[in-house]
Each structure stands twice: as structure tokens, then as C-alpha cells.
């Protein structure tokens, strides 16, 4: 929480969004981390910024996106998602201040003499980097990566099926850079309960085959904003249906505007 920041202003939101981008977890794995941050006293705005900025911005998916759509499109998507996350987080905190949404009653006070970097340095110094430690870390990493690889392969399979049954002309007509194509993209992203690793190849196809960069961005982002698992976890964590439903209410319109602008001007 010291790194995330205890302030309820822009600084805390920026730190939360940056933490979401840097943390290498899938869209469902990140939910548990967000819930724990809320339990540790993070504001609801920080939690929302963390969740919205994070799901497909993990380091592994960034490399995959660069391979699929190129470096500059990937960087553009990351920056735009952070902007949406920061705006949503600020609005959430403002609504809490006005009494529209309930605030976080959890609060954990850190000792006055607590310094993160000195404590982290002490912990690293006491860690024994032996051969068994390195082997155990690699083994655990390979074991845990199965979940990510499974969803990536599932996404590739879905993209392959789309390519097999939809010609480029049909795909471009249905999911092209039009308002109808954008609406259909958001509808499919809302219905599909696919992890971020699985949605990435499909989003890349929307950009490369349908020539609709906004639709690709919307597919990645609305899969987060309208994900019913995320909405339910927010409800269980905050004990508020209002907070849970304000997630799509405040993020989806931003995503649609950005996606439309990308389709028109990109």
C-alpha cells in the first residue's frame, strides 16, 4: 500500500494505474489482487484504475500484441487504456466524496518508521539464491504459466475459426470501422467470457483483417468493463451493487468514444 499511495487524489490514481500495467496477471487473476488492495485500504477509485489498466497490459501480452499488431499500435492501446483507467478512477473517488457511492471502510495504518525500499532490500538480502531456489522458481513459473498458455491457445483457436468461416470481406463488413461494426464488437465482447489472453488474437484480427483499430481496442476494453465475473467480485468485495454496476456505466462510454475516434481518424 505504501507504493500504491494512501492519497485519494490524482497521485494515488496514477500509482494504481501504473501498478496495473506493470503487474503481469490475466484479467481474472488480477481480480483477487484488486480485492486484496481494497481490503488493505485502497480507495475504490484506485481499485478501479488498477483493474481497468491491468488485464491485457501484462508484459507477456504486450509482447504478443507487438508481434500481432506492431509496436506503435500496442503502445497506443496501452496509453489509451491508462487514460480511461485514470479518468474512471478519479470519477469514482469524486462520487464517493459526494456520497453517491459508499467509501472504503477498510484502513490499515503503516508504522511511521516503515520504509518500503529498506524493508524490501532487507528481504532480498535474507533470500538465499541457491540452485534449488532458482530451480523451484523456474518450475513454479512453468507450472503457473499453463493457465495463461491455455487461454492464448483458446484465443488462437477462436481466431482460426473466424478466419475459416468468415471471408475477409464478410469479416470486414460485420466488424468493420462503422458504428454498426463497433456495436457488434462490443456485443460479442460482452457476451464472451474469455480471459484477456484469449481475446488478444481476436482483437488483433479486428485491426489487421477488418481494418478497424477502434473495434480491436473496444474488444479488449469492453471485455474488461462488462465482464460479469469482475462485476460480481466487485460486488462481493465492496458489498455494493451500485459500485459494481458503475464500472461499466463509467468505462464503456469512454471506450466507445475512443474506439470511434480511432476508427475515424486512424
Regions found by a protein language model. Name each.
Residues 20-78, 163-243, 265:
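Membrane-interfacial helix-loop connectors
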Residues 8-11, 125-130, 240:
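Alpha-helix capping and helix-coil boundary motifs
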Residues 1-22, 168-174:
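Membrane-interfacial helix-loop-helix
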Residues 2, 75-186, 208, 245-266:
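Selected transmembrane alpha-helices and immediately adjacent juxtamembrane segments
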Amino acid at each position: 500500500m505504501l507504493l500504491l499511495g494512501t492519497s485519494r487524489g490524482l497521485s494515488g490514481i496514477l500509482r494504481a494505474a501504473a501498478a496495473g500495467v506493470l503487474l503481469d496477471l490475466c484479467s481474472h487473476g488480477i481480480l483477487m489482487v484488486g480485492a486484496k488492495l481494497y481490503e488493505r485500504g485502497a480507495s475504490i477509485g484506485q481499485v478501479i484504475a488498477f483493474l481497468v489498466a491491468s488485464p491485457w497490459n501484462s508484459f507477456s501480452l504486450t509482447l504478443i500484441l507487438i508481434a500481432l499488431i506492431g509496436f506503435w499500435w500496442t503502445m497506443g492501446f496501452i496509453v489509451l487504456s491508462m487514460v480511461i483507467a485514470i479518468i474512471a478512477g478519479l470519477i469514482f473517488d469524486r462520487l464517493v466524496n459526494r456520497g453517491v457511492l459508499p467509501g472504503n471502510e477498510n484502513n490499515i495504518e503503516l508504522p511511521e518508521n516503515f520504509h518500503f525500499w529498506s524493508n524490501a532490500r532487507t528481504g532480498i538480502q535474507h533470500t538465499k539464491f541457491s540452485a534449488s531456489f532458482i530451480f523451484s522458481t523456474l518450475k513454479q513459473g512453468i507450472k503457473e504459466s499453463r493457465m495463461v498458455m491455455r487461454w492464448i491457445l483458446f484465443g488462437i483457436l477462436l481466431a482460426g475459426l473466424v478466419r475459416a468461416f468468415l471471408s475477409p470481406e464478410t469479416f470486414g463488413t460485420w466488424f468493420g470501422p462503422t458504428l454498426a461494426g463497433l456495436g457488434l464488437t462490443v456485443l460479442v465482447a460482452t457476451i464472451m467470457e474469455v480471459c484477456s489472453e484469449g481475446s488478444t488474437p481476436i482483437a488483433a484480427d479486428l485491426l489487421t483483417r477488418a481494418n478497424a483499430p477502434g473495434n480491436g481496442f473496444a474488444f479488449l476494453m469492453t471485455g474488461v468493463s462488462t465482464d460479469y465475473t469482475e462485476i460480481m467480485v466487485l460486488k462481493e468485495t465492496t458489498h455494493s451493487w451500485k459500485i459494481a454496476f458503475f464500472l461499466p456505466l463509467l468505462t464503456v462510454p469512454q471506450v466507445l468514444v475512443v474506439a470511434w475516434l480511432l476508427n475515424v481518424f486512424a
